[in-house]
C-alpha cells in the first residue's frame, strides 16, 4: 500500500492533543498517519465480538479507532504521563481498559476470556521489538493474530527466507510459531517525531508448526539458538561449541542430507527440524 499518509484519523485530534513530552528512552515515535492507522486496524479483521490488546497506544491515534470497533479493548502503556491521560480520555468507554505497565511484565494469556483468543496490535518501540515479539510467542496459545509496526530492517529479518542476508534466528523463531506477512512500509514522515528509519507493518497469524515438524518447542528453540550463535561459523562448528558430540553431529548431518560446511543461514526451517530430530535420535 502506498500514498495517502494523512495526519490524523477522524476524532483523534482530541487524542493527539494529549499532552506529554516525547521520551526518546521509551522509543516514542507517535503514528500520525490517518491511512496507516486505518490500514492497521483493518488488518486485524472483524473486531465486533473480540478482545483487542494494544501495545504502546501512545497518544491514542489507533486507540480511538479500536475503541469504536472492538467489543473490548485493553491498552498497555508504559509512559506514566500518557497512561493516566489515556485513561481519562476513555473514561466513559466501559469497553476500554488502560493498563500502566511494561508489556513484558503483563500476562497476556490472563487477559483473554475463557475460550477466547486475543487480537494484538501495536506500534512497537524499536529498542525492544525482539523482546516483545518473543513475548507474543510465549503467549501464542492465547493469541490469534498480531498486527505490529516495527523497524523495516527487523521486518525484513522476520520474514526472510534461507540464503538471504537477513535470514537468522529471529526468522526461524517467528516462522516456527506464525505465518508472517509484510503489509505496508511507512516513511519517517508518518510519525511524530519522525524516526531516522522506515517502518513496516507486519501481520502475524499465530500457527505453531512444532507438531507438524515433530519438534519439542523448548529443546528445538535451544537448538536453533546454538545453530545461529555465530553467523560466520559453519553449522557444525556452532553445534560443537554447544557441546554436541562431533561424531553425532557428523552422522546426523549426513543422515539429514546436510553438507558438512553449510551455515545455518542456508537451511530452511524444515531442514533444521530434520537435523534436530536426527540428533535427538542419536543422543
UniProtKB/Swiss-Prot annotation:
Its main location: cytoplasm. It is found in: Cytoplasm. Its EC number is 2.1.1.182. GO terms for cellular component: cytosol. One of its GO terms (molecular function) is 16S rRNA (adenine(1518)-N(6)/adenine(1519)-N(6))-dimethyltransferase activity. InterPro entries: KsgA/Erm (IPR001737), rRNA_Ade_diMease-like_C (IPR023165), rRNA_Ade_Mease_Trfase_CS (IPR020596), rRNA_Ade_methylase_Trfase_N (IPR020598), rRNA_adenine_dimethylase (IPR011530), SAM-dependent_MTases_sf (IPR029063). Gene3D superfamilies: Ribosomal RNA adenine dimethylase-like, domain 2 (1.10.8.100), Vaccinia Virus protein VP39 (3.40.50.150). The keyword rRNA processing applies. Keywords: Cytoplasm, Methyltransferase, RNA-binding, rRNA processing, S-adenosyl-L-methionine, Transferase. S-adenosyl-L-methionine binds at residues 29, 31, 56, 77, 102, 123. It comes from the Bacteria. It catalyses: adenosine(1518)/adenosine(1519) in 16S rRNA + 4 S-adenosyl-L-methionine = N(6)-dimethyladenosine(1518)/N(6)-dimethyladenosine(1519) in 16S rRNA + 4 S-adenosyl-L-homocysteine + 4 H(+). NCBIfam families: ksgA. Belongs to the class I-like SAM-binding methyltransferase superfamily. rRNA adenine N(6)-methyltransferase family. RsmA subfamily. Specifically dimethylates two adjacent adenosines (A1518 and A1519) in the loop of a conserved hairpin near the 3'-end of 16S rRNA in the 30S particle. May play a critical role in biogenesis of 30S subunits. This is Ribosomal RNA small subunit methyltransferase A. The lineage of its organism: Bacteria, Pseudomonadati, Acidobacteriota, Terriglobia, Terriglobales.
Amino acid at each position: 500500500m502506498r500514498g495517502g499518509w494523512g495526519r490524523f484519523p477522524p476524532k483523534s485530534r482530541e487524542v493527539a492533543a494529549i499532552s506529554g513530552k516525547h521520551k526518546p528512552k521509551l522509543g516514542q515515535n507517535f503514528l500520525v498517519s490517518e491511512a496507516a492507522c486505518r490500514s492497521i486496524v483493518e488488518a486485524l479483521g472483524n473486531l465486533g465480538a473480540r478482545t483487542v490488546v494494544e501495545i504502546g497506544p501512545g497518544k491514542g491515534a489507533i486507540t480511538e479507532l479500536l475503541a469504536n470497533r472492538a467489543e473490548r479493548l485493553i491498552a498497555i502503556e508504559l509512559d506514566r504521563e500518557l497512561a493516566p491521560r489515556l485513561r481519562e480520555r476513555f473514561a466513559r468507554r466501559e469497553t476500554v481498559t488502560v493498563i500502566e505497565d511494561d508489556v513484558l511484565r503483563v500476562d497476556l494469556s490472563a487477559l483473554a476470556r475463557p475460550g477466547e483468543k486475543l487480537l494484538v496490535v501495536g506500534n512497537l518501540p524499536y529498542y525492544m521489538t525482539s523482546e516483545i515479539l518473543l513475548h507474543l510467542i510465549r503467549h501464542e496459545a492465547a493469541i490469534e493474530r498480531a498486527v505490529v509496526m516495527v523497524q523495516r530492517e527487523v521486518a525484513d529479518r522476520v520474514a526472510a527466507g534461507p540464503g538471504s542476508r537477513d535470514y537468522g534466528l529471529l526468522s526461524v523463531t517467528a516462522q516456527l510459531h506464525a505465518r508472517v506477512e509484510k503489509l505496508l512500509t511507512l516513511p519517517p514522515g508518518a510519525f511524530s517525531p519522525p524516526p531516522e528509519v522506515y517502518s513496516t507493518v507486519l501481520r502475524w497469524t499465530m500457527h505453531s508448526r512444532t507438531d507438524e515438524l515433530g519438534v519439542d518447542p523448548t529443546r528445538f528453540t535451544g537448538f536453533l539458538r546454538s545453530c545461529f550463535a555465530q553467523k560466520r561459523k559453519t553449522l557444525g562448528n556452532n553445534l560443537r561449541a554447544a557441546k554436541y558430540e562431533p561424531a553425532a553431529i557428523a552422522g546426523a548431518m549426513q543422515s539429514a542430507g546436510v553438507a558438512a560446511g553449510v551455515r545455518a543461514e542456508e537451511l530452511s526451517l524444515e531442514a533444521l527440524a530434520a537435523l534436530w530430530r536426527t540428533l535427538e535420535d542419536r543422543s
